Amino acid sequence: MTGAEEWKLSMGLEDTVPARLHEHGEASWTAERSHVCSIRQANDSAGALPVAGKPEPMARSLASAPVSPWHHMDRGSTTPAKARSHSASYHCPSSSQICVPGVGSPSAGYGDVPGASGHRPNLLSWPPALSRKESFLILTAHNRLRSRVHPPAANMQRMDWSESLAQLAEARAALCVTSVTPNLASTPGHNSHVGWNVQLMPMGSASFVEVVNLWFAEGLQYRHGDAECAHNATCAHYTQLVWATSSQLGCGRQPCFVDQEAMEAFVCAYSPGGNWDINGKTVAPYKKGTWCSLCTARVSGCFKAWDHAGGLCEVPRNPCRMSCRNLGHLNISTCRCHCQPGYTGRYCQVRCSVQCVHGQFRKEECSCICDVGYGGAQCATKVGFPFHTCDLRIDGDCFMVSPEADTYYGAKMKCQGKGGVLAQIESQKVQDILAFYLGRLETTNEVTDSDFETKNFWIGLTYKAAKDSFRWTTGEHQSFTSFAFGQPDNQGFGNCVEMQASAAFNWNDQRCKTRNRYICQFAQKHYSRWEPGP
């Protein structure tokens, strides 16, 4: 690149943002516009972010913070982002994150940069895969930065490296000039909820850790109290990096040419992914509070390294302090008893007939699961679908939050009477969105029933004696869990599960006679077949 060349970065939006790059000697770039920030700026910004216990005025740092033109992009969009360089187009491989041709000073970690003196670099001599040391440094950087968020996070989890996610990231980085996403379904242990951070940089201009610092520097523009990014800025890389419930990380780097310019694609994959929004409002990436104060039961330990500002939730070394009765088997990884037939309860200490007209009888639940279009205790009542009462939709399913309170089985019957079931939360995505929504309801919504006892909400999970485990109302096994720290703990008496307001709406086992509000769910397969009422 000689002289001054203009890059026009179009992301398929109405606005096109110019950024003029100049070469000042070998392998040194600067930018005239604040839309593209240097790696040195990013590192300085990351270091300038307030640390818990050392708050700094956010306004002081905003002037030097990186600003990006892609703040209007929908984080949940499936439309591939596009970028243009020298009037030639290429497709970034990210759909939910932004692929940015950034600029910066050369990284000392790379030594002599191929192509720095102006000749075309040999990509075959460039190491494409991350070494074990680089992977360790990237993971360490993520955990260190996650421990430095401000305000401090009460539920931030420690991340572990995933080779399967790293392979996904390598594959996506290799597709530098295409919008095709790797097949997530072929990756063992990961569902489709995978988050992405993608960055395209001039070759040799940055190490991977510096790119991670660049993403974290976007936090200067993020207002956690409003769950919003500053005007004319993007924070999508930052919010995914510090998404509290993302616990698995894998990254990849690949060299490539973009319009004859040597570039590097930096990609990180996160599971479970984040950056969800609800009714156009983005969900906050973590819960504010004292470090590790809202860890779930699965990650009840608190990890803090020497260079961490705060603690991160992790799996404790000795998670179980219990035993199972009546020949029950204790699963150490889940801290749950698997009971012999005929026994149930948390410790297998508890030793149920209903005629179902239009439905199936579930022995574990001692109740009916109604066919589509029918409700009531015996599934004998034909019901119409209440389309107008959906409070929110998640992945096609309808969720209704009750204004009144009832016992668990009273709530179950009321949902069933409308043709639905108590909510089944089977992924981190649904948990995050519901917790965010209920948190806003807590201060804005009025309860019509004045005798409710708590601000908690029943979901369709109960402890089944015959199965010696928690099961959903439909009888399905509970594969996803979000129990609060120290829960479940009611020793067989709290067999029903609620979303607990005081624990950031993580789960708590509760006595089924407690009066709570509740959440009804109508699956897409149900209302797509529903017969309209008269």
Swiss-Prot record:
PROSITE patterns: C_TYPE_LECTIN_1, C_TYPE_LECTIN_2, EGF_1, EGF_2, EGF_3. Residues 394-521 form the C-type lectin domain. GO terms for cellular component: extracellular region. Signal peptide: none annotated. CDD domains: CAP_euk, CLECT. It is found in: Secreted. Residues 139-270 form the SCP domain. Pfam families: CAP, Lectin_C. Residues 47-88 are annotated as: Disordered. Keywords: Disulfide bond, EGF-like domain, Lectin, Receptor, Secreted. Residues 316-349 form the EGF-like domain. GO terms for molecular function: carbohydrate binding. Gene3D superfamilies: CAP, Laminin, Mannose-Binding Protein A, subunit A. Disulfide bonds join 324-337, 339-348, 415-520, 496-512. PANTHER family: CYSTEINE-RICH SECRETORY PROTEIN-RELATED. This is C-type lectin domain family 18 member A. The lineage of its organism: Eukaryota, Metazoa, Chordata, Craniata, Vertebrata.
